[in-house]
């Protein structure tokens, strides 16, 4: 670490700068929907209870992602503030969930709320689900940041004078377009124990694609010291959400037991599109250490919120109640750790 650390030589050195961060983010749980349930008598209370299989039966694990920043310094403006243009990629998180359920008390009284009369689904005793969700974001921002004040002149014990950066708060303004993509897929497979799939089975698939285009409005507040910094950065982007969904269902039932199970086939496809209001917002709490004039290590904690999207488990239409099923009122929330570096040249 050099003895002399002036603001002119130590910070924002060079015309280009870049950053790379590894993200480890958790995702909010699915919209809760009951897929199947079976009533039973509680011998302790004498009351009726339900064994249920829902879309939130299993939690999500933390998924890795990345944030990459590439920026170009545009020099100072007439008020001596630093100007820059930067591109940021934020995303790469992919979440998967696999779950299953067997009716614990046989198949005589299993209720399927999402498809009470659909052949191949109603009356099933075995259920398997698969879920996938991902997130990616691209943004192009103009950044205007305050510079540190005048350097301090410090005399060493040997009588030599040296320049040192004066610590201070560095607010910044961030504005620019942002594009984000959220894709979700859900698949349900049903069967009966000991029965051939050709006699009884069902497969239901939901695909949801969301593209959000908005304008970033945000800022940054950094407490800059000679060799370390800490602060926060936040951005909010009101957006247009371009949503599309695709659903398919195929089922067959030719069993005669238990009585009352619908017989026949299920076979339908449904597509829908919509443009709706959306929102993208993120907040980062960060701290970093300047190792050299051109390189710093950084750690942080991140929050990310995406709203106005079609999440897969909000689109269930297996009973075909809606002609063009599409619910764009979904949202997802992410939070987790980040660590990486910043450098300039």
Task: Please give the residue ranges for each predicted region.
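Transmembrane beta-strands of outer-membrane beta-barrel pores
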Residues: 24-28, 89-95, 146, 177-183, ...
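Repeated loop/turn-to-beta-strand initiation elements of outer-membrane beta-barrel proteins
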Residues: 78, 150, 227-230, 294-297
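Outer-membrane beta-barrel "beta-signal"
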Residues: 330-345
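Outer-membrane beta-barrel biogenesis signature
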Residues: 1-17, 146-168
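Short glycine/proline- and aromatic-enriched beta-strand/turn motifs that initiate or cap beta-hairpins
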Residues: 1-77, 81, 86-88
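Transmembrane beta-strands of outer-membrane beta-barrel proteins
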Residues: 16-20, 81-87, 155, 169-177, ...
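Residues on the lipid-exposed face of transmembrane beta-strands in outer-membrane beta-barrel proteins
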Residues: 20, 68-72, 140-144, 175, ...
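Extracellular/periplasm-exposed beta-strand and loop segments of Gram-negative cell-envelope proteins
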Residues: 31-39, 46-61, 94-135, 182-211, ...
């Amino acid at each position: 670490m050099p003895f002399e650390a002036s603001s002119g030589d130590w910070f924002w050195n060079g015309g280009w700068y870049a950053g790379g961060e590894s993200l480890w983010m958790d995702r909010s749980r699915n919209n809760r929907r009951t897929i199947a349930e079976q009533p039973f008598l509680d011998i302790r209370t004498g009351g009726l209870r339900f064994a249920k299989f829902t879309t939130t039966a299993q939690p999500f694990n933390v998924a890795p992602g990345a944030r990459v920043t590439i920026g170009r310094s545009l020099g100072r403006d007439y008020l001596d503030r630093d100007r820059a243009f930067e591109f940021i990629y934020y995303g790469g998180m992919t979440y998967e969930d696999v779950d299953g359920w067997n009716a614990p008390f046989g198949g005589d009284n299993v209720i399927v709320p999402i498809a009470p009369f659909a052949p191949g689904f109603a009356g099933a005793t075995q259920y398997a689900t698969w879920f996938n969700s991902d997130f990616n974001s691209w943004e192009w921002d103009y950044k205007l940041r305050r510079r540190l004040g005048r350097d301090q002149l410090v005399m060493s014990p040997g009588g030599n004078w040296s320049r040192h950066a004066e610590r201070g708060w560095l607010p910044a303004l961030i504005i620019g377009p942002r594009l984000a993509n959220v894709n979700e897929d859900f698949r349900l497979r049903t069967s009966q124990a000991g029965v051939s799939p050709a006699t009884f089975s069902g497969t239901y698939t939901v695909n949801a694609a969301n593209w959000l285009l908005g304008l970033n409005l945000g800022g940054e507040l950094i407490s800059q010291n000679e060799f370390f910094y800490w602060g926060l950065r936040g951005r909010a982007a009101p957006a247009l959400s371009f949503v599309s969904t695709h659903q398919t269902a195929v089922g067959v039932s030719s069993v005669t037991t238990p009585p009352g199970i619908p017989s026949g086939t299920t076979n339908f496809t449904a597509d829908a599109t919509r443009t709706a209001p959306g929102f993208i917002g993120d907040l980062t709490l960060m701290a970093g250490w300047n190792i050299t004039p051109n390189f710093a290590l950084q750690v942080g904690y991140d929050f990310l919120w995406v709203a106005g999207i079609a999440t897969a488990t909000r689109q269930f239409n297996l009973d075909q109640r809606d002609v063009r099923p599409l619910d764009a009122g979904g949202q997802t929330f992410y939070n987790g750790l980040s660590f990486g570096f910043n450098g300039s040249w």
